């Protein structure tokens, strides 16, 4: 009896030791909260169930991924205005199967031609993300109609029908939207049109589940449909062009500009009439057989590519998933990428970015050698990509070169007041779609949201405040310039595997977007056997988040040395990271901002997989 008891004690001790070792090597794989979503014909994942269902409906009616994507952008701009409104921006990547290439559509608005740094400084104004001072031209609708015109098959009337219905007849409000309204109530009450838009006629707030209507927004969309109808006899493209022109060049634009000028914003009609969504080649890198495409250096998207190039120099599988080594090298690679982002990334219409050097594998190898596996870096220093770039030989703007980050109590206080979890107050959504033919639509729309956008009179359009991502600093590459686009955080991603369509992925989360995408992508491709076929497992695994950079949003706070970690990571792993010098804040399960929405084509079966992050109420469907 005594020997049996001793054997049990020894067995328990061995088991405890093994559990501790397993925790240090990586997390345990647990069942996902959401079931596998798989189908043969298509997959959709988006930030709201109504957005997902709108895209799904278009696919069922015979539309392609691009028709469905535009329908989702329009519906999202009605029902997700705590995250994104139609006066905001939409960054899009498309993969038309007949073209066999990825194309980038930059629906990011530009600053008015009269907006200069001196204009703001002389008036003692800043770019705080509320009101009209940080306003830029709405870009989302131009991008949406550009996609529809070039790659879609349906009319604007077809794809806008559900958005008009929800705006005119109403839809039920979700709790998240109510929370945002309550949080932003002071700002809402500053602007009469915002108050009429977001509050009941008696000034009280709606409750979750209540029906809300936006008749002014519905009317704007119907005016665009009327313009299309008047020109549809000239062809589908002519009709779509007429709808777009009515918004940017016609009576809708005139109303918006009159409102802006009345309130002292430096816009004129030409800022709208001459605006265009930029259509261009994306940038890309290859990571172990996967080709990852991102928007060019006007976005933070290439930071993901830089981090992957750095990580290719390490044996991630050998380290073990979510082990201390694995998370440490991810954090450190992101620090290096962010230092380059904050130095070199800017509007390429105004700045010659050393893009070739930044994405060079040789440069990444040099950067990887900066990583000390035993200690967290407390520096914030950009690399020098110029020797690896055949086009750029000189850099005259500010360069990150801070040798030692001191603890800053003011910064620490700001972190506790919202900066500690980037993207929780500023918001965004994402849409990922793959259809039966293999066409892919991937978009990250944002801006025009409740908390910052002024409703422009009876147009129902909430004006984007993305200008807060400029710097009012003439030494910075990403400074404010007339007709320039801010270096934005929005970052869709398309991945090909051996040249074939494989994955579309994106997320909200501000500066954190690349971190969510990076960790989810690595979960999918490096640890495929641990989750397949339930894509939700790869999405739900716990994450970390470094704050070691200048925040893109005004006033560009910093979180140097700070790391967030979800509490579902083993405590031994968190302690091991702390011993290396990472200053960890432990958040609740699913506590890191972001909501990865993903669609995937399984190359071995041809099945379409879809997944949506439980960190918010994103929703996925396949059929």
Task: Write out the residue ranges for each language-model feature.
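Internal maturation/activation junctions in enzymes
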Residues: 202, 235, 253, 265, ...
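Noncatalytic scaffold domains of N-terminal-nucleophile
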Residues: 32-53, 57, 65-242, 247-299, ...
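Bacterial N-terminal signal peptides
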Residues: 16-27
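Active-site rim segments in enzyme catalytic domains, especially the processed small/beta chain
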Residues: 79-95, 99-103, 263-268, 413, ...
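Extended C-terminal subregions enriched in glycine
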Residues: 437, 484, 517-518, 527-590
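Alpha-helical support elements that line or immediately flank enzyme active sites
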Residues: 58-59, 142-150, 244-249, 508-536
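Bacterial N-terminal signal peptides that target proteins for export
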Residues: 2-18
């Amino acid at each position: 009896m005594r020997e049996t008891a001793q054997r049990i004690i020894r067995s328990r001790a061995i088991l405890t030791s093994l559990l501790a070792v397993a925790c240090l090597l990586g997390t345990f794989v647990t069942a996902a909260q959401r079931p596998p979503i798989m189908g043969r014909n298509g997959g959709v994942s988006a930030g709201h169930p109504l957005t997902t269902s709108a895209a799904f409906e278009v696919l069922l009616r015979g539309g392609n991924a691009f028709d469905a994507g535009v329908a989702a952008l329009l519906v999202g701009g009605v029902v997700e205005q705590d995250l994104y409104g139609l006066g905001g921006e939409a960054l899009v990547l498309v993969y038309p199967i007949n073209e066999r290439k990825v194309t980038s559509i930059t629906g990011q608005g530009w600053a008015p031609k009269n907006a200069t740094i001196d204009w703001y400084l002389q008036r003692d104004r800043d770019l705080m993300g509320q009101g009209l001072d940080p306003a830029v031209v709405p870009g989302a609708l131009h991008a949406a109609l550009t996609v529809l015109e070039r790659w879609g098959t349906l009319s604007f009337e077809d794809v806008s029908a559900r958005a008009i219905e929800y705006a005119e007849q109403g839809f039920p409000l979700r709790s998240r939207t109510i929370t945002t309204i309550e949080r932003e109530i002071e700002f809402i009450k500053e602007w009469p049109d915002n108050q009429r838009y977001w509050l009941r006629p008696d000034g009280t707030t709606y409750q979750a589940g209540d029906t809300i209507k936006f008749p002014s927004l519905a009317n704007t969309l119907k005016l665009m449909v009327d313009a299309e109808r008047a020109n549809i006899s000239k062809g589908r493209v002519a009709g779509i062009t007429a709808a777009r022109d009515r918004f940017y060049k016609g009576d809708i634009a005139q109303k918006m500009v009159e409102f802006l000028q009345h309130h002292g914003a430096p816009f004129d009609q030409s800022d709208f009439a001459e605006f265009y969504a930029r259509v261009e080649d994306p940038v890309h890198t290859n990571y172990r057989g996967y080709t990852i495409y991102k928007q060019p250096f006007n976005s933070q998207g290439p930071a993901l590519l830089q981090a992957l190039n750095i990580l290719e120099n390490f044996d991630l599988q050998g380290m073990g998933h979510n082990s201390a080594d694995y998370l440490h090298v991810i954090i450190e690679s992101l620090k290096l990428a962010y230092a380059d982002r904050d130095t070199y990334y800017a509007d390429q219409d105004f700045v010659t970015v050393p893009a070739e050097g930044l994405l060079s594998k040789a440069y990444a190898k040099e950067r990887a050698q900066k990583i000390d596996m035993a200690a967290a870096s407390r520096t914030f220093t950009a690399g020098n990509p110029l020797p690896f770039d055949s086009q750029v030989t000189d850099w005259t703007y500010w360069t990150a070169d801070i040798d030692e980050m001191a603890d800053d109590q003011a910064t620490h206080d700001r972190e506790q007041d919202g900066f500690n979890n980037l993207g929780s107050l500023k918001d965004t959504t994402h849409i990922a779609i793959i259809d039966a033919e293999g066409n892919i639509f991937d978009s990250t729309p944002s801006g025009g949201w409740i908390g910052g956008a002024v409703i422009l009179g009876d147009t129902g359009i909430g004006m984007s405040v993305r200008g807060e991502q400029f710097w009012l600093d003439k030494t910075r590459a990403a400074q404010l310039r007339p007709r320039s686009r801010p270096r934005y955080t929005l970052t869709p991603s398309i991945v090909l595997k051996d040249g074939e369509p494989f994955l579309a992925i994106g997320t909200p989360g501000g500066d954190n977007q690349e971190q969510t995408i990076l960790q989810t992508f690595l979960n999918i491709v490096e640890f495929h056997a641990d989750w397949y076929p339930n894509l939700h497992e790869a999405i739900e695994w716990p994450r970390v988040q470094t704050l070691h950079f200048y925040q893109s949003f005004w006033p560009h706070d910093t979180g140097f040395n700070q790391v967030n970690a979800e509490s579902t990571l083993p405590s031994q792993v968190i302690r091991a990271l702390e011993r290396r010098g990472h200053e960890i804040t432990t958040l609740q399960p699913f506590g890191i901002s972001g909501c990865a929405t993903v669609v995937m084509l399984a190359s071995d079966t041809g099945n379409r997989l879809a997944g949506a992050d439980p960190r918010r109420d994103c929703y996925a469907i396949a059929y």
